Amino acid sequence: MKYIIEAFDKETEQLAYEIALPDGCDTQLAAIMGWIASQRGDEGYNLTSEQVAAIEVLANRTIHEHDHILQLTCNID
């Protein structure tokens, strides 16, 4: 599964940028997101500040959320 953070401008709701998360992070993301079932590859989730903070650690980078709506998408490789 490929996971991507999509950042949308809060005013225009246009896609501002994307961040691909590291391969093999399924187990860590499941814990962060509270998933019980495996993902199908067509899901999208709005992210809370707590989830963003945990994903920043996982991705080893800062995600600027103050002026963006952040969503996590699950995509089949």
Predicted regions and their residues:
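Acidic, low-complexity intrinsically disordered segments
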Residues: 31-77
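A short beta-strand micro-motif
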Residues: 3-8
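Short, flexible N-terminal segments of the mature chain
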Residues: 15-40
